[in-house]
């Protein structure tokens, strides 16, 4: 088994106990309020983990909206499915660099607390760009600062010890190279957010 999949499978049942879920929910709610999410959007939650972001998103979405939530860890997906029961959500075990979705499908994609874990960030970015509709948005978001993210990964397990989050401006520059328009790139000691957009005209067939 892929060591990273095994790592996340092993911690799936422990994940929600490591953080105050009420406090996390408040942080997510405040962040989502700033993102001008329409009630009818079709959204992809990449690296959904135990479903915390999906759960927060559902509170902002209407009955016609859809959330596709994917993760490489089958156990994480099982925990999420048990915790978040809503007909607007589809749960799948899938790799972010090779998703099962049609091109130009999603209005918005979230990578919440997951980006450093992608083994091939360029391939992942290109795949997410493919499934985004023109002018659709990608959010790379962490609710803690970059230094803390990297410190946690360095000491957690050899499976994730090299999973480094780049400075926001450096990752934003890469997203530009990979065909996105960057709308914002900000980081503080307690926050990290890059919002990017797929251009209206991409030259793709």
Task: Enumerate the language-model features and the residues they cover.
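Short alpha-helix
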Residues: 163-178
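Class I SAM-dependent methyltransferase SAM/SAH-binding core
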Residues: 44-46, 50-98
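A short acidic, Gly/Pro-enriched loop at the edge of an enzyme's catalytic core
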Residues: 97-108
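Core SAM-dependent methyltransferase catalytic element
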Residues: 178-179, 186-205
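A short SAM/SAH-binding and catalytic strip from SAM-dependent methyltransferases
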Residues: 108-120
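Conserved class I S-adenosyl-L-methionine
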Residues: 1-36, 52-56, 76-79, 137-162, ...
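A short glycine-rich, Lys/Arg-flanked "PGG" loop and its adjoining helix->strand segment in the class I
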Residues: 122-134
């Amino acid at each position: 088994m892929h060591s990273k999949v095994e790592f996340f499978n092993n911690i799936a049942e422990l994940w929600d106990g490591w953080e105050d879920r009420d406090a996390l929910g408040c942080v997510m709610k405040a962040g989502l309020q700033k993102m001008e999410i329409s009630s009818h959007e079709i959204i992809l939650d990449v690296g959904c983990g135990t479903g915390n972001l999906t759960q927060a998103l559902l509170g902002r979405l209407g009955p016609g909206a859809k959330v596709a939530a994917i993760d490489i860890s089958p156990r994480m997906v099982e925990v999420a499915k048990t915790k978040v029961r809503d007909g607007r959500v589809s749960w799948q075990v899938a790799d972010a660099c090779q998703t099962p979705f049609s091109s130009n499908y999603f209005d918005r994609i979230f990578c919440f607390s997951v980006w450093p874990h992608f083994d091939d960030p360029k391939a992942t970015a290109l795949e997410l760009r493919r499934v985004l509709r023109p002018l659709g948005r990608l959010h790379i978001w962490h609710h803690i600062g970059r230094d803390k993210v990297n410190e946690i990964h360095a000491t957690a397990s050899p499976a994730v010890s090299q999973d480094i989050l780049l400075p926001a401006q450096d990752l934003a520059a890469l997203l530009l190279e990979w065909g996105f328009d960057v709308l914002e790139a900000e980081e503080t000691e307690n926050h990290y957010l890059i919002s990017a957009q797929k251009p209206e005209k991409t030259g793709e067939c």
